[in-house]
Amino acid sequence: MQPKGNKYGTHRVIEPKGVLPQPANKLDNNMDVLYDNEILIDVQTLNIDSASFTDIHNYAKQQAGEGAPVEKVMEEVKKEMLLNVELQGKHRNRRTGSGGMLLGKVEKIGDALKGKINLKEGDRIATLVSLSLTPLRIDEILEIRPEVDQVDIKGKAILFESGIYAKIPNDMPEKLALSALDVAGAPAQTAKLCQYGQTVLILGAGGKSGMLCCYEAKKRVGVTGKVIGIANSPKSTQRIKDLGFCDVVESAAGMTPVQVYEMVERLTDGKMADVTINCVNVPDQEMTAVLCTKDDGIVYFFSMATSFTKASLGAEGIGSDVNMIMGNGYTKGHAEFTLQELRESPELRKIFEELYA
């Protein structure tokens, strides 16, 4: 008889007791015992959160030493990932606090869930809850793909009863679906936040979440609205220009928040943005977003590199009366919503296939 589990997975928390799995310092990742309300997953790929992978990669380069070959850097990435799991029983970045998601096959379903959910053993799924709360065991790291933040492994994971997931669709490659589902909350939230005729600013427009948000924002604001895409690297700037989803595309490479503010002020004739969406995967972008948004406007911080303290105190410090939404990656129906964008837009699907599939 399987032991009874808590809906939210608190039975897997080792330390400190009484907290939920996400903030817990350590989880029980023993996969030999399955609780009655858990789903055991045979893991194929970890899709590491962009902010987390960027941090791990930068840390690995420091550890490997200046000028170290790529192979040495990747070995350091492996060490850091394995250490995260060894110390915590899950893959939560010890500096950013963020995780990611995974792709795998349902290996076993707890007795209390069998027949009550739309899953069966053998189904291929992507988890839509963070790796920062998912019990994980890594047996072997097979391949690291730093350009897409994906790591193929041999290992097991647990999805709790409250955990959400998406079945991998039949009409697109698994890696393509995984890459889109990783950021599914961003375009779905964009659809809720943007209205006809508004000016929408997207920071990090040339990245994975940024491209999806640009596409959705333009649909929502229509011909009388304006979508401004700001990217960083020359490559990402050209990428979002070529897609044609934005009315204006600019590069912010090497610019300070004040310089970006002055650029947006010029582009909007001093009116600033109604909605600003921050998809940048590095820290210290909070004030750029706040400065560029008009009073009573909305700033949506999708990036996991966001500091609530910097955003809230920074906004207060300049007397900015903006409404801030902090990294809410979930909204109802977000998985199917985002996959549908790839079906709707041949341009978007093509670039995602080239970059991520």
What are these regions (language model features)?
Residues V85-H91, G100-L103, A112, I125-G197:
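NAD(P)H dinucleotide-binding glycine-rich loop of Rossmann-like/cofactor-binding domains
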Residues D32-N47, A60-L131:
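Glycine-rich beta-strand-centered segment in the early N-terminal region that forms part
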Residues P257-K271:
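Short amphipathic alpha-helix with an adjacent loop that forms part of the alpha/beta core around
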Residues T190-Y196, T268-G270, L291:
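Glycine-rich helix-loop-beta junction characteristic of Rossmann-like nucleotide cofactor-binding loops
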Residues M172-E250:
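Mid-domain Rossmann-like dinucleotide-binding core that forms the NAD(H)/NADP(H) cofactor-binding site
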